[in-house]
Swiss-Prot record:
Family: Belongs to the UreD family.
Gene: ureD
InterPro entries: UreD
HAMAP family: UreD
Main location: cytoplasm
Protein name listed in UniProt: Urease accessory protein UreD
This protein's record includes keyword Chaperone: yes
Pfam families noted in UniProt: UreD
Species this protein is from: Acetivibrio thermocellus (strain ATCC 27405 / DSM 1237 / JCM 9322 / NBRC 103400 / NCIMB 10682 / NRRL B-4536 / VPI 7372) (Clostridium thermocellum)
Coiled-coil features, chain-numbered ranges: none
Highest taxon in the source lineage: Bacteria
GO CC terms in record: cytoplasm
PANTHER family documented for this protein: UREASE ACCESSORY PROTEIN D
Length: 262
């Protein structure tokens, strides 16, 4: 089934450093994508880009493709305007592919808003990030069990989120998360374990210290309303997963982690 736009929906962004400041070198988008004017706030020297959508949410047949290229030393935070609502679907699916390319010294923080999969929805997302020496990459995701406040919990059809990360041409991280409520007990052990929201975050760069991991563990352990797991990857990174009962709460925790990272 084709989406209402009749074609793949694309967003392309390229950023560079000019006079010591990250700026937008090139951009291109098709419906429903739009991007707001870049803005600069906070610390870290990031150019903040907000991705907007003219659609009410993700619909059956939607096919999204986001490509980001960062030149040497560019620092970009890419975030969404509002929650990503994945609407009910008859028989089809919706897909999204993200491609990120980071040159030497570049830093991308990919921070989409929380995702809410409605009943009978099916969504497939794949992300590929290619990092050159000296670059850094953060990704995060918050997934709700559904429209929780309406009592719609784990009634989506399928949800898939996959990510591959390459550093200097070497595959250093691969993860695939498949959620199928009809065949999996998503409220049980190994899944949401009685919680309604899940946050995931990964940070990848060559300098990941044990002191950083210890600091994050101490901070998260002190939070009694969530459960978490944090592990260093085989090379150049760590991943943390947090279970809670509120998107706002998990967003605030991810913000605290980011404040430690940069």
């Amino acid at each position: 089934m084709k989406n209402k736009f009749g074609k793949e929906s694309r967003l392309y962004i390229r950023a560079k450093v000019s006079d010591g400041k990250t700026c937008l070198q090139d951009s291109y988008f098709t419906a429903p994508f739009k991007i707001a004017k870049p803005f600069y706030e906070g610390h870290g020297g990031f150019m903040n880009l907000m991705v907007m959508s003219a659609s009410a949410g993700v619909m059956e047949g939607d096919n999204y493709r986001i490509e980001v290229e960062l030149d040497k030393g560019a620092r970009v935070k890419l975030e969404g305007q509002s929650y990503q609502k994945i609407h009910r679907m008859k028989n089809g699916t919706a897909v999204q592919y993200n491609s990120f390319t980071l040159a030497d010294g570049a830093f991308l923080d990919y921070a989409p808003n929380p995702t809410i999969p409605f009943a009978d929805s099916a969504f497939y997302s794949n992300t590929e990030c290619r990092m050159e020496e000296g670059s850094a990459f953060i990704y995060s995701e918050i997934l709700a069990a559904g429209r929780v406040k309406s009592g719609e919990i784990f009634r989506f059809r399928e949800y898939h989120s996959g990510i591959k990360i390459y550093y200097g041409g070497e595959l250093i991280f691969l993860e695939n998360q498949f959620l199928f409520p009809k065949v999996q007990n998503l409220e049980g052990i190994g899944f949401f374990e009685g919680f309604t929201h899940q946050a995931s975050m990964g940070f990848f760069c060559k300098q990941i210290s044990d002191e950083l991991i210890d600091k994050l563990c101490v901070m998260l352990t002190a939070m009694e309303d969530v459960q978490f797991g944090l592990s260093k990857t085989k090379k150049y990174g760590f991943v943390v997963r947090i279970l809670g009962n509120s998107s706002d709460r998990l967003e605030s925790i991810l913000k605290l982690i980011r404040n430690i990272l940069y």
